[in-house]
Amino acid sequence: SCGENVSIHPGVYLFHLNMVCFGDNISIHPMCYIEGAGGLSIKSNVSIAHSVSILTTNHSWGDLNTPIKYNPETFEKVVIGNDVWIACGSRILSGVTINNRAIVAAGAVVNKDVMANSIYGGIPAKLIKKLDA
């Protein structure tokens, strides 16, 4: 589903849109790679800067007799809360929830949930600072 005032710039790759839910007032800037096979919810007032990847799938590697490339994929939903800014070049991995009023710093790799009212950055992403209420 798609809310109001959703701006998707040229050069954005979107896959499995039937599994993606957009809120209102969302901007997705050029060269983003967004796939929703595992389920993706982007709430309202979200800005996704250029060159961000959002992935809801991953490779498993449990069958040692099969190349990793051919092991089954896993699927986990990603949730991006209200009032979130995801800065350029960030990677949001499957199974992550970014809670309300959060900032993901440029170049971060988010592999765990992001607390509300906070800034996360780094590889892997860690809490940098709580935002003042």
Question: What are these model-predicted stretches?
Answer:
Residues S7, L40, K112, A125-K126:
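Short, electropositive, low-hydrophobicity segments enriched in small/polar residues
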Residues G11-F22, S27-T97, I123-P124, L131-D132:
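Flexible, glycine/small-residue-enriched loop-and-beta-strand segment within the central core
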Residues S7, W85, L93-S94, I103-A105, ...:
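A generic "structured core" feature
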Residues T97-G121, A125:
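C-terminal/domain-terminus segments
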Residues S1-Y13:
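Extended, small-residue-rich solenoid/repeat segments and analogous flexible loops
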